[in-house]
């Protein structure tokens, strides 16, 4: 993403959320990548996991306290390097 796109996303997040709040991040990762994902989100107050019916993937929801839209984008930047990760 470029700087303009980041600023637009931060503005949208800030318009739709009253910070600080608990923000829900949703990801799908290949089975076996959950620990890597969890290690990058130590601030999560709650983590929900649901394996796919075939067992190849796991869907995760992380409930994390966030103080701003910029913090939210920082989390997405942190997890971006995980192979096979889908952000929802």
Where are these regions (language model features)?
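Long, contiguous binding/interaction regions
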Residues: 1-59, 65-88
